[in-house]
């Protein structure tokens, strides 16, 4: 699994700003959690895409969706998200995106909207994932339609406590 994990982590590093991913050791620690999963997409023995997610009682949370740079635009991300939506079996799926400030972030939001997700405009901050980074302003997208502000706060409390490992009321 170590070689596969190294490949997964390389895709994460190549796809996300460092403040949006954990350290190598921090990411590897997640593999021992019962609520954390990584869905992979491989072709001819090559890892081309990953989707890291959590399964909680009432919802699933996609933390990372990424494809190898050479495999982007091939529909792999769509297949991975569709697999998670199937796994959710009618439960809410949420994920975080950067605010729509440029063409890349707007395109990413449109990608998720094509898969049925709704952009929620409420304020949301990702707590620091490692000691060398700060908070990151993000927005939540949801698979079962728009969230009320109260619903988003309830999801944020779970993310704060179980994903970011901070006080549930952090930034609420």
Describe the function of each predicted region.
Residues 88-104, 109:
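Conserved GNAT acetyl-CoA-binding A-motif
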Residues 40, 46-54, 59-66:
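Conserved beta-strand in the GNAT
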Residues 30-40, 134:
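A short helix-loop-beta-strand connector motif used in the catalytic cores of GNAT acetyltransferases and
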Residues 65, 70, 96-100:
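Short strand-loop junctions, especially beta-strand C-caps/beta-turns
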């Amino acid at each position: 699994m170590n070689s596969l994990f190294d490949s997964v982590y390389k895709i994460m590093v190549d796809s996300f700003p460092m403040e949006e991913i954990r350290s190598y050791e921090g990411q590897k620690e997640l593999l021992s959690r019962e609520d954390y999963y990584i869905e992979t997409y491989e072709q001819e023995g090559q890892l081309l895409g990953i989707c890291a997610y959590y399964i909680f009682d009432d919802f699933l949370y996609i933390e990372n969706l990424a494809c190898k740079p050479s495999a982007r635009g091939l529909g792999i991300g769509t297949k991975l998200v569709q697999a998670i939506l199937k796994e959710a079996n009618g439960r809410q799926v949420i994920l975080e995106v950067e605010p729509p400030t440029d063409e890349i972030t707007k395109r990413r939001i449109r990608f998720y909207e094509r898969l049925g997700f709704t952009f929620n405009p409420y304020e949301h901050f990702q707590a620091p994932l490692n000691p060398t980074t700060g908070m990151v302003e993000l927005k939540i997208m949801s698979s079962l339609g728009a969230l009320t502000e109260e619903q988003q706060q309830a999801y944020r409390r779970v993310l704060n406590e179980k994903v970011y490992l901070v006080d549930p009321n952090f930034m609420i």
